Every structure is written in structure tokens, then in C-alpha cells.
Amino acid sequence: MQDKLIARAKELLSEGKVQKVVGWKKGLFDDDITPAVFATAEELDKDFVFNKYCKANLSKYLVGITRNIETAKSTARMNNTMAKQRDPNAQDKPIPSEVVLVFLKPSDTYSFTQLLKESRITRDDVYAVGVPCQDTVDGGDVCGNCAGKKPVSCDEYIGVDPEAEVAPNTARMEEVAKIEAMSVNGRYEFWRNEFSRCIRCNACRNVCPACTCEKCVFDNNALYTTQKVAETSFEESLFHIIRAWQ
């Protein structure tokens, strides 16, 4: 599968359909995989990797990448307008156009779709390719309970069939059904108990596929929200309720 992805990325680069590729880069060890941007076929051959350690969801990286692309376009348009104001005969300079290729696992495509709905990603700047889930190591209950096994919103698919029927995972809703069956007070106590385990490491915020704020409210020193351990149950609830509604 890795060879197929590299070959397709090279093809799109050589045809000029994309100018950059967002994928995964190998590190010193087999499991040392990090997201990376590739611009040439040589870089792809040297560092691109796709295996069971490619856990990172690449969709969030598109927020910054497409923003930079759109900023370059806006700057070029503004420069052309200002040039015309100085000299009505001035020739417009070309508006830069760039499309980035991104590989998305089935579950990642749902994050991609949500960010599109929130206008956090410019769709015209992205060529999305759906790829199969590699059954990532240590997926455990997370991958086993995943509801996003059917890729969506991609321009093409490699190794996955977007039309294939996926059997619903009914087991993942059993815990939800138990919580919904509780009384209001019972649900409150359940979540209070869950919140009490929080050490405010911010891992849930950082990994959340929909969290894309430039400045998080919980990084505001003026509001005393940067402290790690909540002093009261109210602070615990505040953090998680805001996280749930972001």
C-alpha cells in the first residue's frame, strides 16, 4: 500500500495537479512516525511511510496549510489592486494557485468533513485521497469502537471502497444506552466521577479533530485557566463542558 500511495503522489505532482503532499514521515525507529509535508518525488522516496504506526489524523494540519494558501492569494490580489491605483495601466501579476494532496484514513475523513462545514479548510485547495485504516497499534477499544470505517468527502480512494456496506457497530452504543437510562442525578454523578479523574494534561484538547482555535480559552493567564489541577468541582466541570461544546 505504501508503494501505491507514493506512486500516486508522484503522479499528481508530475501532472501539476498538486504542489505538496501531506503524509507521514519515518523517524529513527519504526514506530517514530510524524506528519510531514513533501514537495518532491525525491522527498517521497526518501521519507514517506504508511504503516500501522501512522496514527496521526492529518486533517487538522490542513487548517494552517490552506490558510497560508488563501493568504498568499489575498495578498496577490491586494497588490494588484494597489498597483492599479498607482498606475491604471499596470498589468496584474498572476494569483498564486496551490493544491495540497492529503491522505486520509476513514475515521480522519469525518474530521475533514466537519472542518469543511466550519469553513476551517478551503476545499478547493485540497485534493483528498482516502486510504485504508492500517489497524493501528494499540488501537484497542478506540479502533474497535470506531464508527468511521466508511470514508467520505474524498476526491479518490486507494485500497478502500466508499460504496461498500459497513456493518453497524452496535456494541459501541451499549455504554451510551446505560448512561441514557440513568436518572438526571445519576448521570450527573457519573460525569462528576469521570471529571474527577482529570489531571488537565490537555491531551483531549490537543488530539480533538475539531479543536482548531488559534488561542484556547484555557491558555488564558488572565482568567487563571492555565492551571493544570482544578481547585474545585466547578472548575473541573467548566473545563469539560466547554470542551464538549467546542
Labelled PLM ranges:
Residues 173-196, 213-246:
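Ferredoxin-type iron-sulfur electron-transfer modules in oxidoreductases and energy-metabolism complexes
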Residues 148-159, 197-199, 203-224, 246:
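Iron-sulfur cluster-binding cysteine motifs and their immediate structural context
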Residues 1-191, 195, 209:
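Iron-sulfur-associated redox domains of electron-transfer enzymes in respiratory
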